[in-house]
Amino acid sequence: MGKVQLTKIESYNNIDMIQTSINSMLDNSLLSKKLFDGAKVVIKTNLLMKKKPEQAVTTHPIIIECLANYFVKYNCEVIIADSPAGPFTKTSLEGIYEASGMVKAAQNSGATLNY
């Protein structure tokens, strides 16, 4: 039987608690860290539209940043990616990634964006 892990996070401002929770969840998963070294990892966000994190429409960038941090720690090439509704152009993606906080998440974690 599989495991479920829950952690109550009061605020997205507590990045240390979020990072610890994500690390614990992934460390306790069935993923083999032997697969990670040098692997390419794509983190698929849920960017429905050009909205700020405070509007709670898209995946919060702190969650994406912490996931990216985890895989970067294992020498992975991390790409934050999505294909929101509308035209798939660099200009469109840049606007959505900037508004949603994904540009900062990528910069902070060492990940890249898919454009």
Regions found by a protein language model. Give the residues of each.
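N-terminal and secondary-structure boundary signal
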Residues: 1-115
